[in-house]
């Protein structure tokens, strides 16, 4: 979940967007398709536009400006860029079909995109193989954004997972659609009938939240969550990696994470990767929990060896994995911005951009491909003040205020290419990483798609 910045935090004119990490489809917007291990600046992208939100999906990226314009780039095989075609675009380009329809928020799933307009309407484009577009009788994919019917409710927050989506309305009702969680639920809850919202291909109300008012929602690979106006966190779906802070293998009904897990403080913001979560409380403390084997949690680990989730009734206790309960890495206290990729994270603390977690494609921005086990500053951005951060599954984006003196900018190389200068320079190295991504993803999801191409994007 990306926090809505206040008016005082609006991006100044002297700002620039930086991108790094996986780039097999041009999702960094740099005009080429080579992975980038250090942050690189997109020349003049933010001038004179001011950026409101940045985020990414499986192999694509999206930026929303203060004026409500949507810019997209990267993988477009299923039309997830909403440009009316299926050609990949390695540089940020405006989604012209949305001109005159200001966008408030955008959420990127693996191969689809959900948009929220300023008047509370939800749009979708991309793959619809699992009903993730919220249009039950629609085509297998949609290359232009189309409206989703949410029972005439005004929506205030959206989230996109691997193969499902979630929305919260102004009245605090939560809707879910897409069948991405259903196969996991059937496997872990044999003989049980799953609630409709797990199998619906159109928005279906999430039952079990009737006594709470959702302010925001989030979606992981096989789980969902909501944050209420009372500062409570509810979770449902798969608990394979302890991401639900519960002993059940699968939660078919939302359950609240008890307040003592957050030191009895109200939660004010929450974010989700594929299999881990990050939350911030009213005093600025940060809590992380869930999968930890790539450094996702940013804190010292208990042993992870030997833990295995067995098939069982969802209400029977399972062997709780290490780090399945929220715990606070003190170094993250006071973060003003946070974003989670599939297994890595970005945060801004005191104007400094920090990264940690999975780093196979260089998305932690330290110039290496070694996992980062504790939050550390992105050295290449130390001379700039971080304003916003956003993650795709395996790539990173940051909006930074540039120093007054250009000579102070570290690593000033700019590799942005105009459309006329684009060259497809994918190397064998990128192909090898795509193969590694596919092997790693098989651990995260037991259901595979033959046409998936793993590259390190969400």
UniProtKB/Swiss-Prot annotation:
Keywords: Cytoplasm, Guanine-nucleotide releasing factor, Nucleus, Phosphoprotein, Repeat. The modification Phosphoserine is found at residue 427. RCC1 repeats lie at residues 15-67, 68-119, 120-171, 172-230, 231-283, 284-351, 352-402. Residues 420-458 are annotated as: Disordered. One of its GO terms (biological process) is signal transduction. Residues 426-442 have a biased composition (Basic and acidic residues). InterPro entries: RCC1/BLIP-II, Reg_chr_condens, Signaling_Regulatory_Domain. It is found in: Cytoplasm; Nucleus. GO terms for cellular component: cytoplasm; cytosol; nucleoplasm; nucleus. Pfam families: WD40_RLD. SUPFAM superfamilies: RCC1/BLIP-II (SSF50985). One of its GO terms (molecular function) is guanyl-nucleotide exchange factor activity. Its main location: cytoplasm. The keyword Phosphoprotein applies. Interacts with SEC5. The interaction occurs only in the presence of magnesium or manganese and is stimulated by dCTP or GTP. Probable guanine nucleotide exchange factor (GEF), which may be involved in the secretion process. PANTHER family: BTK-BINDING PROTEIN-RELATED (PTHR22872). This is Secretion-regulating guanine nucleotide exchange factor. It comes from Homo sapiens. The lineage of its organism: Eukaryota, Metazoa, Chordata, Craniata, Vertebrata.
């Amino acid at each position: 979940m990306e926090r809505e910045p206040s008016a005082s935090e609006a991006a100044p004119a002297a700002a620039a967007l930086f991108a790094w990490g996986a780039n097999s489809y041009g999702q960094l917007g740099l005009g080429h398709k080579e992975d980038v291990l250090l942050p690189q600046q997109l020349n003049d992208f933010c001038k004179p536009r001011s950026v409101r939100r940045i985020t990414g999906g499986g192999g694509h990226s999206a930026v929303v400006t203060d004026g409500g314009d949507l810019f997209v780039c990267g993988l477009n095989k299923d039309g997830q860029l909403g440009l009316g075609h299926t050609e990949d675009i390695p540089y940020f380009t405006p989604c012209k079909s949305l001109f005159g329809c200001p966008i408030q928020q955008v959420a990127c799933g693996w191969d689809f995109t959900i948009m929220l307009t300023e008047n509370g309407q939800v749009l979708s484009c991309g793959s619809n193989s699992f009903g993730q577009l919220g249009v039950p009788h629609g085509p297998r994919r949609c290359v232009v954004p189309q409206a989703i019917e949410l029972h005439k409710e005004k929506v205030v927050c959206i989230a996109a997972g691997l193969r499902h989506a979630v929305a919260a309305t102004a009245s605090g009702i939560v809707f879910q659609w897409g069948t991405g969680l259903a196969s996991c639920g059937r496997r872990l809850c044999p003989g049980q009938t799953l609630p409709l919202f797990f199998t619906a291909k159109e928005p279906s109300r999430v039952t079990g939240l009737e006594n709470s008012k959702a302010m925001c929602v989030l979606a992981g690979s096989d789980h969902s969550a909501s944050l209420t106006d009372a500062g409570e966190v509810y979770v449902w779906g798969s608990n394979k990696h302890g991401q639900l802070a519960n002993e059940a293998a699968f939660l078919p009904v939302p359950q609240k994470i008890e307040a003592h897990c957050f030191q009895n403080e109200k939660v004010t913001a929450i974010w989700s990767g594929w299999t881990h979560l990050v939350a911030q409380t009213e005093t600025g403390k940060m809590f992380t929990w869930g999968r930890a084997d790539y450094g996702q949690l940013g804190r010292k680990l208990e042993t992870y060896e030997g833990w295995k989730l067995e098939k069982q009734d969802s209400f029977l206790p399972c062997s709780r994995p290490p780090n399945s309960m929220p715990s606070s890495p003190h170094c993250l206290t006071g973060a003003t911005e946070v974003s989670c990729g599939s297994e890595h994270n970005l945060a801004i603390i005191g104007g400094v951009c920090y990264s940690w977690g999975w780093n196979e494609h260089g998305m932690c921005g330290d110039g290496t491909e070694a996992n980062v086990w504790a939050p550390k500053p992105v050295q290449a951005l130390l001379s700039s003040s971080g304003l916003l951060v956003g993650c795709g599954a395996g790539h990173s984006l940051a909006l930074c205020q540039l120093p007054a003196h250009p000579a102070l900018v570290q690593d000033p190389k700019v590799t942005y290419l105009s459309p006329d200068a684009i060259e497809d320079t994918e190397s064998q190295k990128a192909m090898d990483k795509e193969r590694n991504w596919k092997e790693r993803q098989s651990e995260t999801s037991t259901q595979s798609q033959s046409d998936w191409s793993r590259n390190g994007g969400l």
